[in-house]
UniProtKB/Swiss-Prot annotation:
Family stated for the protein in its record: Belongs to the bacterial ribosomal protein bL27 family.
Domain of life: Bacteria
Cited SUPFAM superfamilies: Ribosomal L27 protein-like (SSF110324)
Any one of the GO BP annotations: translation
PANTHER family according to UniProt: LARGE RIBOSOMAL SUBUNIT PROTEIN BL27M (PTHR15893:SF0), RIBOSOMAL PROTEIN L27 (PTHR15893)
Gene designation per UniProt: rpmA
Transmembrane segments: none
Maturation propeptide residues: 1-13
Gene3D superfamilies: 2.40.50.100
InterPro entries referenced in this protein's UniProt entry, alphabetically: Ribosomal_bL27, Ribosomal_bL27_CS
Protein name in the entry: Large ribosomal subunit protein bL27
Biased composition regions of type Basic and acidic residues, renumbered to the chain: 18-29
An example Gene Ontology molecular-function term: structural constituent of ribosome
One Gene Ontology cellular component annotation held by this UniProt entry: cytosolic large ribosomal subunit
């Protein structure tokens, strides 16, 4: 038998059976977006009021906005949500009156 013929006629079989793999089965971590303080609740300076992607709710009086659009209180007071320009909403912090 020709040695060259024997090498070209070699057939290899799988040592492990091929198993289908699913392309599903993963999910992103929760981002915990939304209101952290409701209308009428008291807040401290620096406390997060609303976490959002984009401007769903706009900052009003005494409210700052972070680079990820998070709204936070600049001063201590009471949270107040109001509508403006028809369908838009803004949140403000009204300072507490000091009773002396």
């Amino acid at each position: 038998m020709n040695k060259l013929y024997w090498l070209t006629d070699l057939q290899l079989f799988a040592s492990k059976k091929g198993v289908d793999s699913s392309k599903n089965g993963r999910d992103s971590n929760p981002k915990y977006l939304g209101a952290k303080l409701g209308d009428g609740q008291s807040t401290k300076a620096g406390q997060i009021i609303y976490r959002q992607r984009g401007n769903k709710i706009y900052p009003g009086l005494n409210v700052g906005q972070g680079k990820d659009h998070t709204l936070f209180a600049k001063t201590a007071g009471v949270v107040k949500y109001t509508k403006f320009m028809g369908d838009k909403t803004k949140v403000s912090v009204l300072p507490k009156e000091d009773n002396k």
